[in-house]
Amino acid sequence: MAAVVGVSLKRGFSATALGRVGLQFQACREAQTAAAAAPRIKTFAIYRWDPDKAGDKPRMQTYKVDLNKCGPMVLDALIKIKNEIDSTLTFRRSCREGICGSCAMNINGGNTLACTRRIDTDLGKVSKIYPLPHMYVIKDLVPDLSNFYAQYKSIEPYLKKKDESQEGKQQYLQSIEDREKLDGLYECILCACCSTSCPSYWWNGDKYLGPAVLMQAYRWMIDSRDEFTEERLAKLQDPFSLYRCHTIMNCTQTCPKGLNPGKAIAEIKKMMATYKEKRALA
């Protein structure tokens, strides 16, 4: 310290001036510490409903969280609320990295993943959280995805070969170019954000397969290793499974992975036109 003071004095600074600088620096640090310690209270309004409670009706319940003591994502706030404020709050979550799709929900009016959606730091705004829309609710933020998964199963989302004699004995290879055709399709995590944002799916969810399932159907239709493309197309010929899509494009807008289900559906429609022409000429 003496050496520093000596250098400072040689440059024209007095010991008194140096002392003032030190005091100002200390005051600045104390002010920063005080500012950081000031609570930043954020209000969350969360949909609650417990079917096991007699007479319980859906309602919005508010919780207050100090953002200084919480992670940056909405899922961090939900976990903090469950762990420290209300253990009865129920929601799905797993990977916390936008990979599994478990924590899909409606946050401030848009379907997204709670683990990748940052908390709105405007303390004057209430963050509203609902389960995925137009789905039966099991409890709180947990939607019933039974119909969604049944529809996914119906498209047989796996590689199908007409000659299965070599199954398990050799690899089914494909070119780099054919593999690249699957980009933007295989990344789907089946979170159902797109399907539950689609008005056509709201109206005809029992018959219309929805954007998530149709995009996966297209993924297998264009896989060069699959040999059941025509059979897959034949399953979609009825008026509802495919053709309830009216290109509203909510699906593409809301996809948390940045995929384009609307485009995939349009490609299936083009394939269907060719398929029907081929059948008419047969």
Curated annotation (Swiss-Prot):
Gene Ontology biological-process annotations: aerobic respiration; mitochondrial electron transport, succinate to ubiquinone; proton motive force-driven mitochondrial ATP synthesis; respiratory electron transport chain; succinate metabolic process; tricarboxylic acid cycle
Assigned protein family: Belongs to the succinate dehydrogenase/fumarate reductase iron-sulfur protein family.
Catalytic activity: a quinone + succinate = fumarate + a quinol; (R)-malate + a quinone = enol-oxaloacetate + a quinol; (S)-malate + a quinone = enol-oxaloacetate + a quinol
NCBIfam families according to UniProt: dhsB, PRK05950.1
Region Interaction with SDHAF1, annotated ranges: 148-220
PANTHER family associated with the record: SUCCINATE DEHYDROGENASE [UBIQUINONE] IRON-SULFUR SUBUNIT, MITOCHONDRIAL (PTHR11921:SF29), SUCCINATE DEHYDROGENASE IRON-SULFUR PROTEIN (PTHR11921)
Activity regulation annotation text: Enol-oxaloacetate inhibits the succinate dehydrogenase activity.
Modified residues (N6-acetyllysine): K53, K57
Organism: Rattus norvegicus (Rat)
Keywords carried by this UniProt record: 2Fe-2S, 3Fe-4S, 4Fe-4S, Acetylation, Electron transport, Iron, Iron-sulfur, Membrane, Metal-binding, Mitochondrion, Mitochondrion inner membrane, Oxidoreductase, Transit peptide, Transport, Tricarboxylic acid cycle
Protein name in the entry: Succinate dehydrogenase [ubiquinone] iron-sulfur subunit, mitochondrial
Pathway recorded for this protein: Carbohydrate metabolism; tricarboxylic acid cycle; fumarate from succinate (eukaryal route): step 1/1
Membrane topology: Peripheral membrane protein
GO molecular function: 2 iron, 2 sulfur cluster binding; 3 iron, 4 sulfur cluster binding; 4 iron, 4 sulfur cluster binding; electron transfer activity; metal ion binding; succinate dehydrogenase (quinone) activity; ubiquinone binding
Job description of the protein: Iron-sulfur protein (IP) subunit of the succinate dehydrogenase complex (mitochondrial respiratory chain complex II), responsible for transferring electrons from succinate to ubiquinone (coenzyme Q). SDH also oxidizes malate to the non-canonical enol form of oxaloacetate, enol-oxaloacetate. Enol-oxaloacetate, which is a potent inhibitor of the succinate dehydrogenase activity, is further isomerized into keto-oxaloacetate.
Record: residues binding [3Fe-4S] cluster: C198, C245, C251
4Fe-4S ferredoxin-type domain location: 178-208
Chain segment of the transit peptide: 1-30
Primary subcellular site in the record, as a coarse category: mitochondrion
GO annotations of cellular component type: mitochondrial inner membrane; mitochondrial membrane; mitochondrion; nucleoplasm; plasma membrane; respiratory chain complex II (succinate dehydrogenase)
Cellular localization per UniProt: Mitochondrion inner membrane
Sequence positions that bind [2Fe-2S] cluster: C95, C100, C103, C115
